[in-house]
């Protein structure tokens, strides 16, 4: 008995950081009701991860208006995922440029998505927190809450902000735009468009 306990103690508790959505494919996709641009993803689209050449899972998140937003609804757009936290000063600095950047490229098929993974108390952000972020930084692009708990996959190192660029087929082309400044972000967007 003591050897069994010792073995369990040495192995420890390892959380399983996956969900049913990790293996989702396009056949499960459903249109969401919101005012953002939307296109049905191609048949056979499958989630594989957040690394270069992979397709992120179809995360369904709340926006600053309380509406459901699907990542895959932006299929056909070049998408920048700005993974931020409310308490993060560099994230706040970057947020001041979000709307200018989005508006400059929106007509070319670009979508800027801010995904807040934590509020000031390191909890999942509420719609009120999303709305405050959008208001404080004059963001009219989607501000989303990581309510499905992808934080450990989105920011495995805990370093905010993380900027992931997706091409028009939802494939990750850059898994961390660095340095995270507006000039560099714009250069990467222009390359992708």
Model-derived regions: residue spans:
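N-terminal targeting signals for export/organelle localization
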Residues: 6-58
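A short beta-strand-turn-helix
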Residues: 59-79
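Conserved helix-turn-beta segment immediately C-terminal to the redox Cys motif
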Residues: 77-78, 93-116
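Short pre-active-site segment immediately N-terminal to redox-active cysteine/selenocysteine motifs
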Residues: 77-79, 84-87, 119, 159
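Conserved redox-active cysteine motifs that mediate thiol-disulfide chemistry
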Residues: 83-100, 122
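Short, internal strand/loop/helix patches
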Residues: 113, 127-168
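Residue-level recognition of beta-strand->loop/alpha-helix junctions
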Residues: 116-118, 145, 176
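Thiol-/selenol-based redox modules, centered on thioredoxin-like
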Residues: 159-193
């Amino acid at each position: 008995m003591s050897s069994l306990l010792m073995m369990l103690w040495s192995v420890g508790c390892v959380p399983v950081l996956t969900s049913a959505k990790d293996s989702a494919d396009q056949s499960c996709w459903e249109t969401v009701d919101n005012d953002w641009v939307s296109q049905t993803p191609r048949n056979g689209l499958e989630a594989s991860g957040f690394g270069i050449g992979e397709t992120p899972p179809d995360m369904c998140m709340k926006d600053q208006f309380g509406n459901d937003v699907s990542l895959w609804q932006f299929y056909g757009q070049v998408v920048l995922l700005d993974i931020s936290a409310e308490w993060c000063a560099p994230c706040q600095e970057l947020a001041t440029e979000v709307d200018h950047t989005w508006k400059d490229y929106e007509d070319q098929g670009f979508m800027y998505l801010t995904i807040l993974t934590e509020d000031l108390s390191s909890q999942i952000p509420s719609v009120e927190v999303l709305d405050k972020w959008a208001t404080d930084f004059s963001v009219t692009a989607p501000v989303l809450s990581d309510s499905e708990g992808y934080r450990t996959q989105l920011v495995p190192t805990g370093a905010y902000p993380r900027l992931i660029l997706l091409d028009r087929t939802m494939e990750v082309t850059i898994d961390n735009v660095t340095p995270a400044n507006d000039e560099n972000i714009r250069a990467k967007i222009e390359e992708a468009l």
